[in-house]
Each structure stands twice: as structure tokens, then as C-alpha cells.
Amino acid sequence: MMQGNKKCTDGFSDTSSIGSVLDEADREVSNLTDRAFRSLCISEDTSFHDSDLALSPDVTSQVSGTFHQETVGHANRKSGIWSQLPSQGTEHSGWAATFQQQPKYVQGEEKYPKTSPLPTPVQRRLEVPISGLRSSSKPISKVSSLIRSFDRTETQSCDSRPPPSKPPALKNPPKFAHPPESGVNFCFDSAFLTVRRVPAEVSNTHQGSHQSGRAPGEQESPKNPEIASHSSDSLLRTPDHVAGSFEPRYPSPPLKPATAEPGRGKEWIPRRTFLHSENSAFESWDTHQPKLRERKDIAETTPESKAPKHYEDMPLLKEPYPAESKGSPYQARANCAQEENRSPSGSQSTSGAWGARDPGSQLFPVEGNASQIDPQVKRSKAPWRKPKTGKGGTDGPPDALEDKKQPNRRGLPLYSKLNPQGQLPENGVLDMPEESNDHYNPPFNISKLLTPIISTKHVLETSDTQPVEISPSPPGQLNGYQEKESSEAQSRDSYKSKAPSLLFNLKDVRKRVKSTYSPLPLLKGFDEKTRGKLDSKQEPLSNGVTLPDGLEENPPTELLPDNVPGVLHSSTQKDPAINSRESFAVSHPTFSSPSASSQTHFCVNGEAAESNSNEKEEANGESELDPSKGGGHPDCRENLPRKHLSLKLFNRESEMGPAMAEMKPHQLENGLSRSVSQETETERETGFQSLPLNQKFSPGPLSPEEEDVFYSDSQSDFTPCRQTKAKFSTSSSDQSFASFEDQQKVCFTEGPQEDRKSHVSAGDKQRDETAVEKEESQQCASRNEHRGVDEQRQEEIQRKAQGVSGGRPRKASAEDLSARGSWMGADKDTAHTHAKDPTPLPASTNKHRLFPIKDNTLRATPVIKPIILPLLRTVSSEDSLSSGHQENELPKQLWGEDAGGLSASESQEMPNTPLSNNDVPGTQHRCMVCEDVQEDPVHTAAQDETSQQTRKGSFSFLPPVEEENRMKPSPDTAGEGLAQEKSKSADLGKLGVPQRIPTIALLPDDLEDSPPSLPQHTYWEEQGFKGHFLSAPRAGPSGRRLVPSEAETSPNPSSLGESSTCSPAASSIWEEASQAAGEHWQRQEPPGPNPWASPGPTGLTRREDMTHGLTWEAEGSDPSDFRALSPRGILLADAAEKPEPPALLEKAAGKPPAVPPKTEKALRRAKKLASKRRKSDQLLEKHTEAWEGKSFTEDTQGTERRPVSPGKGPRPRFPAIRSLPPPTHRHSVSCGWEPTGRRPWGPQSLTPLPPYPATQKVLQDPQSGQYFVFDVPLQVKIKTFYDPETGKYVKVSVPSSEEASSEPPLQDALAAPYLLYPGFRPVPVTSVMPLRCSSQLAAPTFLRQGSGHRPQSSQGSRLQPPPERLGESTQHASGQCPRGPSHSPEKESAEAPRLSIISTDDLEDFATEGVS
């Protein structure tokens, strides 16, 4: 570092002298010349190397010099590794040595001793030019040397090029060379830059440049930790850096100088501009355009050939294409490149993830961008420039864009190199073809080099400049803002979202290019999609869907095409995108095997795949959308789906971004993440047109969001390529399924869903999605259930609703779930459906939908969304658990309804109940399946759950609940019956269970049949756990529905309120149910089935179906089993769903393990919520009874910020719920819940609950018989109540005497909502309550709780619960029930203590981390 610093000073002075010596004109000329020469050199593989090397340090210096002199030192240290790595391969060692040496020499000759391997003949050769350039050509050599290089560009690349490049290198290297290690880093940056320019090298040296590529790539790999930081900046991997360094650098050329020296930055800017806009560069493009087209066409024709040929271009396609090694090759190759990056980048999840992601995925995608976008850009270099110019606000950004392009040029070519490095192992196979193609590809590599810039423009600019650049940027920016506001998780997403924006620009170009170069089907698909997006998309999707529905692996295969259209849609975010998607749906067969692999990868990688897929697909999708629109159809499709998924995922993640927690649920579950991807896909289809900035806007949020989206960002890092594929496949599969279903339903739901999705697409897309998508869920509940998972499952539910109608989709959904077996597979299927559904839906309605929903969800989105999303993520993560996805749906619904999606959430829930008919019809009337969808929204939640359950294998218990709950409404909704029965069955089983939990006729039953009721109640609590997440939304709808039909649903609402007290209507239901008394529920339970028909009664019926089911389950083991089956009645249900409730609990209570708050916003929210919780607890302690009504109602709202409540509130509730819920909750529920807690809490909860129905659970104090509304998140010993007056969260310790009486039930509700709620199982509460605190603290605890206690709750609820609950009931009911407060304290003392210990601290921590 010392010599490096010296040199840095030297270099600075050098750069300064260069700056002064070379006047602006000269510098610009030299830059332009350099770029022109580089472009030509890229065209001529040979002359580019030295220039690349020399220039690479320059660019590196600019990029990394300012940012990473330290890092450069680090990288330099690792540069030794790099230099050593080059030695690993003969060519690579030579090439890498050359690269390293030149940069190192650029840094200084001192560097050579440090990296001894560097001084190789090539290196020395480079050295000499560098030295000469540095010494003699500093001012002149820039222009002179570049001119010289141009003269020799085509003849001699190294000698003439190094001098021209050397001065830039000198400019930078002196500064950069200051640390020898820095120099190495720059050398690596050089490698990056060289890679950027290396496309020529990669062309030359893909034969021999793989040495260089590998060396740089490996240097990058060693350097990746830093490179993740600074090289990330240099690299396309710059997502991190894009957020940090490239953001400034990319957004404006001036920032580039800011990043590096002004002169350098300027240099680079002109260079990049020159490369992209200058004639020389364009000449290179044009010169190689024919070749590119040929190669592109060849790539289209022969994906394998294309992969080798477009090694950089096709790697993505190639990797996906090798279906056999799709997971492996793409990942193996990507892993080689990516894991090298990842391993080093492990420290930098984002950067590393992007580096890891990008190296392989974006290596391919970016290289794909380079090659694939390049072909288009080359073909339409003018068009590219036109879009650049015609990108609206891209004129300023074009420079920045080119800055981005250039950094990406370095970065992407480095990815090319990284690809060589990482993929060289694989490319050993590909290498030969690649090398041949690279020999042939040099021109293409130039395009690649340029394209990586363009691709960088997509990806990097997507991050920073894209919002400005992209024509759709304004609407997208709105979305971007919403999404940015939605989450910092969109920091990364911004790249991806900008990729869509860029894609819009590129899409304009690509549309032209596609019209010119791409197969007619694409254009056809474009037009088709444009004019008949619904029908056309449905048809192609149907084609793809049928297979996905029928096939497990085929759906991915077929779905990939669907996804491809979706991706193309994302790419061509305008109507052409729809056509493209349609066309891709038609052309999907090409991607069937990659699709399957992609899907698998997605599954394997889950969210990681999502996140990586997003970014990579962003780059890939962009770049490969070019090929997609251009010749590289196969790649385009592969990449396009990726892109689209990326877009969609990130849109969704963007929407989820606002709630990192929501994004975390994405991370939580692939389904969620992929749902995000799908929703994002949809939103990116439709919303990209307006959401380009949504993702562009995600620059800041993107990084957090990706983190949000993937707590498993490392996962992302590790499985970028696979994930990208998975994403493709996921989106495709979802699209296929969704499209298949959508074809039945899409016509109806597409518009509304798109609207909702559009709304969801909004910044608070997740929340909006939950709000509007809840409505959409009402129309297409699948989409609603989880904003991220919702999307998947909504589509799956649509698919299932239509599968019920269309038999197969739902079956296929179940099949997919079964065949995919894993939650991942299931989620994938769901994601497929969702991707598919969103693919058709979002394009048209996503935009307008996007914003309206955002408004709704934005009201409480910032905190709640993050809270819910982590919750959902946790649930999603545990989606493999049967309840995870359903619960995710519910949390999403919760958030949606909480956010502003209360109506939407209730809509979704009400679709479960009457609102399904009321809200959904309105929401879904757009959907032809208004009632079906309306019921479908009911079963969208339910069917989402069912789908999710089905894919989780939890379907087995879903169907019983389906039948028992759904049967009653099923007759009412005869036509919808099938779709609704399954969807509603699922809904009732899932949401229905919650509603049943709310419908816990147990109260009357408990009043009379304490033990049976208790099992029932326990059951409901059980179910309520997951049901509270599910039932909270259900409560929301029930509340909503029941609020409309409060009197009639009042008994059911009471039961609903019990489980879904969180639901606003549930509150009123509680109120009225309290008035109606516990038995009134059951009395009105019969009316319930009738109300099923009517919106008002529907909720009641559903609730009462639930109540009946509860009674069945409570009174009868089989009904209970069904109940438990759906919620967690059966051990299977418990096993399958228990994990889900724990996931839910984890999410709801702590959402900590799976979803720590990754963004400052999330942390702040979590802390804020925690403080609010404390305040709320204190307040509630004071105003236990009074506040519980209001606070709890509001606590539901607060519970929306559930993590806070879970952190604090759940703790008290755990103790209370434990003892109280088993006997008290059950007994109390049946005893005094009607007048005491129900009325006060019902009305009070009613008022606050409507906003946060999903998070509230009504628990009864066994002693007082009062029912308290507990925030689902508040499952800790401390109950967090929301003070409606103060708007603060009051944390009430369950032990409080008053609280014990009123709060403990609330805490039970909180615990039950979290853990208890999975079934409102008092016994599980008893058993689960202690676990609950732990479970809430961590998913394992929840899982333990869910598994150990939830079975008790399910079985104990219906079988054991009578004894256990009765026993506990007896011990607690007799012991504590009489003394409700004492009961609560007792529980707190006995059970709560560990709950409080674990729950309070852990949950709070988790809430702080994951709730916000």
C-alpha cells in the first residue's frame, strides 16, 4: 500500500498533469480515440489487450481508485492470487499475468515484486508500453497512443494499444498504482475493465484470454470481497457499488470523476460515450454487427453453439440450455465464476451476491447483454443510441449510462473474464467452441464489450441512471419511488428495476431490432400481446401452462417460455413486451429444458435465486432481451424469462422493498420471492412500462430489497445463475400455470389482477399488492395471498380456482406441489402460476393498479410492510411447511389489509367471506370469474393456501377443511363451488381455518362444551395461528364482510374476531358476536352457510363453516381433524402446517430468524415498533381493558408492525395464551367472551381492528370471559396493544392483573395469532405458549412450538386439547381461569418466563431485525 500510495499520489499528479497537459478537448479526443480504438481493437481482438489492460487500470482507477484504494490494496493482495491464478492456466496465466502486470505496472513497477508472477513476457511487454506511455505519453500518448493504437488496433493490439490505453492507465494507475495492491486491484479492475474491453480480449483470449479472463476473473474472485465492494463498482457486479460508487459514478459522468479523478472520470465518460456513441465504437459495432447477427442467429439456432460462440453472450443461454447442467453448469460455471466471486464476496452479500450473481449469471447475462444486447445494439447501435438519446432523460444519463456501460464494460467483460475464469472450467468444454467462436467472436466481443456497457446501462444504469434514462422511467420512477419507498431492498432492485427501464429503452431498440432481427413469432407475440395480451398471452401461456399443469418438470419447461414472454414483456415493458412474452410463451418449447432447470434452480435457490435472478435476469433479461428481440431467441427466452422474472421479482421485491420484511418473506419463501418475481413480473410486464423506474427507483432499495428479498442473499450469491434459471422457470412455470388458469380466468382476472398488480407494483407494491391485490386476490386471491407469495399463490389459486373449474390447473398445482414435492417446487409452481398469471395480467392493469394499491398500502406500509414481509418471508421460508405459504399469504394479506390493503386484505379475506362476493366482485368483477374469483379470492387466500399447502403437501388437510368449510359455502357458490371449494376450502382450510378460528363457534361451544369447544377453539387457535395470519386476513375479510353483515355475521364474526380479531370486521364481529354471545355464533352459524351466498352472510357462513368446522373439530375429532387438517388439526397438518405456523409465528412474532431487518428503515421500524410495543405494553398495562379494545384493535394495526408487537406483545401473550388459551381462551371464549371481551374488544377491536385485522387475534380471558384482541405479531409475553388514540403501541405484560384477564387472552391471541393462532389452540397455547415465545423468537422455536405444541393444539385441540386443554384448562381454567389475571401471570411465571425471556428479547431483537 505504501508504494501504492506513493504511486497513487504519483498517479494523481500524473492524472492531474495529464488533465492539465491534455486539455479538455485533448482529453476528450483521447478518450474518444481511446474508446474508438478500443472499439476497433475489440473488433480486432489483438490490439485491445494492452489497451484494455492499460485502460482497465484507468477505468479501474476511476471506478476503484477513489472507491477502493484500500480495497484495491486488498485486491492487490489478492492480485497475487490473481497473478497466481493466471499461472494456473497456461494461456490464462500468461494473459492474467499480462493483465495483472500491465495494471500492476500501471500501478508501478514496484508492484511486480509484490506480484512476482506478473512480470511475464506479456506483462513486461505491457509494462514497456505502460512505462513508455506513462513516462512519455501521459499527455500525448493518450491521443497519440490511442491514435497509434487505432493505427495498430487492427494490426497490433498489444503494443499500439497499450500506449493509448497506457496513458489512461497511467492517468488512473498512478493514482491507482499508488498502492501496489491497489494497483493489483486496479489490475483486477483492469481485468474488469479489460474484461469490459476484454470482449475483444475475451474474443482473442477467450482462446487465450480465458487465461486473462480466468486470471481477471480469479483475481476478481480473490479480490471479490473487495471487488464486491469496489470491483463490484467496477464490475457489473456493481449492484453494491452501483448503490454506492456506481450510483454516483453512473448517474452522472461527473460522478465518475467523483469516483475517480475528474479527468479520469471525464475520460471514462467520453470513452464510454465514445464507445457507445462515437463512430469508432459504432463502427466496431456495425463492423461486427453482421457477425453479431450471424452469431446471434447462430446462437438462436444453436444455443450450444451460441453459448460457445456467444460465450459471453450466450453463457446465460448456454448455461440454461444445458438443462442437464442447468443447475450445475449454469451454477457450476456460474459457481466457478460466481463462487469465486461469492467466496470472496461472501463478505459482501450484496456486492458479493451481485458479483457472485453477476459473475456467473450476469457474467452470462451481462455477457449475454454484451453479446445479446450487443447484437441488437450492434444491429441497432443507432437504435441503441437512439433509445439512449430517446430515453427521455437519458441524455445526461447517457453519459452516465455510458459510464455505467463502461464500468459494466469493465465489469461485464470482466464477467466475461470472470465467466472465463469461473466458467472456464465449464468453458473448458465451452471454451473450445467459445474460443473458436471467440476467435470468430472478437467482433461480437466488441459488441459484447459495448453491450456490457449497454448491459451495464441496463443493469448498472438500471441501478442509477436508468430511472433517468428510461422512457418508462417516469411511470417506472413513480413505481420506483413507490418501490424505493417500499424498500431499500430495491437498492439492488434498482439495478433490476432499472434494467427494466433500460429494457424499455432497449425494448424500443429491441423492438426495432426484434422487428428486424428476431423471429417473427416474437414480433408476432409482441403484437399479439399488445393487442391480445390477455388472450394471446393466455394462449401461449396456455400452451406452456398445460404442460406445467400436467407436468412437474414440464411446467418449468413450458413455463419458461411463458416466462420468456413475461421476461420479454419485462424487456419490452411496453406492449411489445406483452407480445414478446406472448411470443415467448409460444416459443417456450426452446426453453423447456432450461426452464425446468431454471425452475429447479429457482426452487433450489429459492429467493436467492429470485434475487440473483432478478439482478442477473435484469442484466440477462436486458441483454438477452436484446437477443430475444434480436437473433438470440433461445437465449432471449431464457434470459428474457430471467429478465422478466428479474423484473417481476424485483418489482415485487421493489414493492416488497418498502417492507423489507415483505421482501424477507420473499426471501423466506421462494414462492414469496418468486411471487415477487412473478408479481414483479406482472408488474414488470405491465408495471415495467410504468415501473421501469420502479426497479430503477430501486437503486437504493434494491440492495436492501435484494437482501430483503433474500436474507439468503448469499444464497443469491451462491445460486445466481441457478436462481436466475429458477426464476425463469419459476416465472415461466407460474406464467404457464397462471396463464393456463388465467386463460380460464385471466380474461376475467387479468385486468383486475393486472390492476391490482399494477397497484401492487407501486412502490408499496407488496402492501399495495396486499391491498389491491387482496382485491385482486378477491378476484385472484392467489395473487393476493402473499404479495410475493400472494402473487404466486394467487396465480396458483387462480390456477387452482380455475383448476377447480379447469380441474387440471389446480390439480397441476397440487401436482406441481406434490411433484415439485418441496415447498420450493410448490412455490415454484405457484411462482409459475403467478409468473404466468402476472405475465398476462400485469402488463395492462399493473400500472394503474400499481399506484392505487400503493396508496392503500402506503398508509402503514413502511413499518407494516417490512414487518409483514419478514413475517411472510419467514412464512415463505417455511413455506415448505404447509402453512408457511398460506401464512405468508395471510401476513401479506395482513400487511395488505393492514397497509391500506385492509380493504384489500379484507377484500381478500372477505373474498373468503362475504367480502369475497362484495369486494371480490367489485375487485373481481373485472375478472369474469367474479364470484369464482370472489370466492376465488377467498380461496385465493385459501386456495393460495391450498395451493401452497398442496405444494407443501399440506393440501391433504386442506381438502378436508375445504370440504367441511367449503362444502357449506360450496353449495352456495355452486358454480364457483369447485374452484371456490378448493380455493375456499384452501381458504377455509387456510384462511377459512382462520375464519373458522374466528368463527370459533367454540365460544358458544366452549361455553357449553368447554372440552370439545376447547379442542375446537384450540383447533381454531391452532388454525388461528396460521389462520391468524391466514385468518387475520380472513378476519379482515370476515371483519370486512362481517362488518358489512355485522349483525348476521356477528356470531361468526365473533368467532372470526376470536381468531381474526385482528380483522377490522372481526372486531365488529367480535363486538356483535359478543352481543350475540358465544352461542349466538353457533346459532348464527347455520345462517352462516346461507350468508355464504350473500357477501355479508358469506363471511358468516364461511366463519360459521369455520365455526361448524370448529365445532366439528372441537366436538368431533374428525371435524377437528379436518379443522386441524386445514389449519393444523392432523399431525400431518401439524407437521406440515406446524412448521408454517412457526414460520408464521416466526414472522409474526419475531420474524427474526428468517427475516432480520436488513435495511436501516426496517431496523428503525423495528426499533420504533419495539419502543411502541413497550409503550403499548405500558399503556395497556394501564389501560388493559379499555386499551385492549382500542389498542388491540389498533394493535392489529400495530401488529401490522407485528414484529414490534411480537417482540414485546407476544411475550406476555405467550404466557397468557399458554395457560389462558387452552382453558381460558377456549373456556373464556365460550364463557365470557361474548359480553365481556367480545363486546368491549369487539367494538374496540372493531374500530382499530379494521386497519389491522390480520394481526389481531381475539383471545378470551378464562376468568373474565372477556375476549381480547391480540395482535398476531404480539405473541410474546408482553402484549403489545395499539393505542388508537395515541397511535402508539402499548406493550402490556400478560402478567398484568387486568391484562391477565383481558390481555392474556389477547396475548393468547397474539400467541395464537403467532403460534396459538395457528389454531387458536388453547392447549397448544398451553404447550405452545412457552414454545411460542421461543418460536416467535426463532423459527426453530416456532417450529418446535408448531410441531410439538401445534400437534397438541391440533390433536390436543381436538383430541388431546380436551384433556390437555381441559387439563390445562382445568389447571389454568380452574386455576387461572378463575383468576384470569393470575392465570396470565401464572402462565407468565411458569410458561411466560421463558416466553418472555426468549420472546421479549429475541422477539424484540428479531422484530427489530426482521419485523421492520
UniProtKB/Swiss-Prot annotation:
Keywords: Cytoplasm, Phosphoprotein. The modification Phosphoserine is found at residues 328, 473, 813. Residues 106-177, 202-443, 460-500, 517-848, 877-923, 935-1255, 1344-1412 are annotated as: Disordered. GO terms for cellular component: Z disc. Residues 285-299, 306-316, 482-496, 525-538, 632-641, 753-799, 826-837, 1176-1203 have a biased composition (Basic and acidic residues). Interacts with FHL2. This is Cardiac-enriched FHL2-interacting protein. Residues 161-171 have a biased composition (Pro residues). InterPro entries: CEFIP, DUF4585. It comes from the Eukaryota. Residues 378-389, 1164-1175 have a biased composition (Basic residues). Residues 202-212, 343-352, 670-679, 687-697, 712-722, 904-921, 943-953, 1047-1066 have a biased composition (Polar residues). Coiled coil: none annotated.
